Amino acid sequence: MDCTPDVQDKIDKELTYLIPSHKPTDPPQVIANMAIIRSGLISIPIGRTDLIPRGYEIKDKRNLIPVDFPKFKFDLRPSQQKVYDEIEDNAIINAWVSWGKTFTGLAIASKLKQKTLIVTHTVPLRNQWVKEVEKVFEISSGIIGSGSWDCSGPIVVGNTQTLYRNIEKIKKTFGTIILDEMHHVSSPTFSRIIDSSFARYKIGLSGTIERKDGKHVVFRDYFGHNVIKPPKENYMVPTIHVVPSGIRFMDGTRIPWANRVTALTQNEEYMHTVSMLAAAYAARGHKVLVVSDRVQFLKNCAQLTGDDTICVTGEVPHEERESLTNQILHGTKNVLFGTQAIFSEGISIDNLSCLILGTPINNEPLLTQLIGRVIRKQENKPSPIVVDIHLLGNTAKRQASNRVGYYMKQGWEMKYI
C-alpha cells in the first residue's frame, strides 16, 4: 500500500503490539505486523483492511481456485447450519470443545467450492482431518507432510513444518485455507503460512481464542474481525472431584517454575497418589487420562498403576501412537498417561471419561482444552469426572483457587473427596 509518512506511522502504531513479559522486570515482547517494502510502500495483514484510509483503490489479487466438490454426506445441527450460512468471507469460528469444528469446517469448504488447504500442527491432528474427509466426502485427501507431497484433489491436509519450508510452492495453490487450532497463529511459523497465502478465504478454528501470554490480540490481523461463537452444546457436563493431598508444592519466586514442577513430580508420595487415583477411577469403569508435562513422571506412574495402562509421550513415534490409543478406544487398556502437549489439542478418544491433572495448571485455555478430552458424547459413557489434586503452599493454593473459580464460572458441580 502506498502511503504518506503520517499514514505509515499511524498504521505502524496500530499493528505494533507490546506483549508483557512473564517477569515484570523484563522488557515486553514486540510484535510488529506492518512490513516496510520501501520508502512510502508498506504491507499490512489481510485481516486489517479497516486500516486502509478512505479514498484508496483496493485491487483484490487473492486467488479463487474453484474445484468440483463431492457432496457433503451428513446433515448439520442447527447451530452448525447457522455458522455455515454466516460464512461468506474470512472469519474465526470460536466453538466449545466437541461442538464439531472439523465437521463444520469441511461443510464450509464444500460451500466455498475452492481448492482447500487444511493446516494442522501435529500428525495426529492431520490424521484426524484425513479420516473426517473420508467420512463426510468419501474421498481421499491430499497430504503434505511426513515425506508426502500430494496436492491432488479438492482438499489437502498439511503439517505446518512442511508447509513453512515450502511457502513459495503453496502460496498461490489454494482458494481456501483453514487453520486448525488457530490460536497458534501468533507464532511466526503459523502467521507466515497464513499471511503469505493468496487464498481468497481464510478460516480459523479454535475452542480457545484467548492466550495466557496475551498474544490473542494479533488474531484479527490474519482472519479479520468476524468472530463467530456458537453456543456450547453436544458435550457431557463434568463433575469436579477435588482431592486434598497434603503434599507441598514449593514456594519461592527465586526458584524457577520448572524446578518446582520437577521436584513435585519426583516426589514418591505424589507419584503414588496419582497412580492410585488412576487405578481407582479405572476400577469404577472410567477410561482415565492422566496428563503431565514431565515424561519420566508419566512413565513412573504408568509402571506403578500396572498393566492396565499405556503411556504416550513425545518419545513414542507417531506411527505407534494410534495403535496405542486404540487400546483405550477399542481394547482392554483403561488408563492413558500422556503429555499435555500431545493431548491438549484436538485428539479425539471419545470414550475417555476421567481426567487427572498431574501437573499444576494456572492456564485457563489449557485447562479448557484438557477437559475437552473427556467430555465428548458417547453412548453408555460414564458421566465425566475431572480430578483436581490440591497441594499445600501459597502458589498451589492460589492456582487451585483460580481453577475453582473457573469451574464455578462454568456452573460445574464440585465434590471434595
Residue ranges of predicted features:
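Conserved RecA-like P-loop NTPase helicase motor core
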Residues: 164, 314-410
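Conserved interdomain hinge at the start of the Helicase C-terminal
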Residues: 109, 252-293, 299-303
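Interdomain "pre-motor" coupling segment immediately N-terminal to P-loop NTPase/helicase cores
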Residues: 12-63
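Conserved helix/coil segment N-terminal to the catalytic DExD/H
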Residues: 146-176, 187-192, 342
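Walker A/P-loop
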Residues: 89-112, 117
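Post-DEXD/H (motif II) to motif III coupling segment of the RecA-like Helicase ATP-binding lobe
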Residues: 175-176, 181-241, 407
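Conserved pre-motif I regulatory segment
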Residues: 34, 58-94
